[in-house]
Amino acid sequence: ESNSKARRGILRRAVFSEDQRKALEKMFQKQKYISKTDRKKLAINLGLKESQVKIWFQNRRMKWRNSKEKEVLSNRCLQEGLQENYLSQSAMNFASPCPSVWEVSQEQTSPRWKEKSPGNSERLTSTQPPPRANSSQSPLYLYPDHDTANKAVTSSD
C-alpha cells in the first residue's frame, strides 16, 4: 500500500524540527505569501522539499485566518455584552453567536449573591439613586479612535 501512495505523490505528515519551525515562523511574520524564489531558498536552507514549505505556509495561513476570525468573534461578543441594548434580539430576528449578558449572569450566580441581593419589590421601591461610577477611572471606548464627537452622522431618508 505504501508503494501506491508513493506513486500518487501522497506524502506522510512532515515533522519539523524546532529550528525549522522557528525559521518558517520568522518568514511567515515577514510575509504571509512566500514567493517561489524565497520558497526555494528557504527549503534549501532548512533541508526541506519546496512542497513541504509550500504546504506549511498554506496550513499556517489557515491557522492565522482562523485565529483572526475567533478574535473578531470574541470582540463582537464583548461589544454586544457591553452595549445597553433594550431591544429584543428575537424581535429583530437576529440570532447572536454570543450568549446574552443575562444568560451568563444566570449561570454564574451563587446562592450567597442571591441572599445579599435585594428582592424585586425592594429594588423597585428604593429611593436611593443608583451608585455612580468612580470618576477617576478612565472611560471605556468601543471605537478604535475615541474622538467620535467630531464625526457627523448622516441619515438617508
UniProtKB/Swiss-Prot annotation:
Specify where the region named Disordered lies, as residue ranges: 105-157
User: Which tissues show it?
Assistant: Localized to the central nervous system during embryogenesis. It is found restricted to the rostro-caudal and dorso-ventral regions of the hindbrain. In the ventricular zone of the spinal cord, it localizes to the dorsal part of the basal plate. In the adult, it is detected in ovary.
- Biological processes, Gene Ontology terms: regulation of transcription by RNA polymerase II
Q: List the disulfide bonds.
A: none
Keyword DNA-binding recorded: yes
Residue ranges, compositional bias (Polar residues): 118-139
Keywords of the record, alphabetical order, are: Developmental protein, DNA-binding, Homeobox, Nucleus
Q: Which residues bind DNA?
A: 9-68
InterPro entries per the UniProt record, alphabetical: H2.0_Homeobox_NeuralPatt, HD, HD_metazoa, Homeobox_CS, Homeodomain-like_sf, HTH_motif
SMART domains (alphabetical): HOX
GO MF, one example: DNA binding
Source domain of life = Eukaryota
Q: Name one Pfam family in it.
A: Homeodomain
Q: Which GO terms describe its cellular component?
A: nucleus
Annotated localization: Nucleus
Q: What does this protein do?
A: Appears to perform a very early function in establishing the identity of a subset of cells that originate in the region of the ventricular zone in the developing spinal cord and in the hindbrain.
Give the UniProt family note.
Belongs to the H2.0 homeobox family.
Protein known as: Homeobox protein DBX2
| Gene source species | Gallus gallus (Chicken)
Q: What is the lineage of its organism?
A: Eukaryota, Metazoa, Chordata, Craniata, Vertebrata
- The encoding gene is DBX2
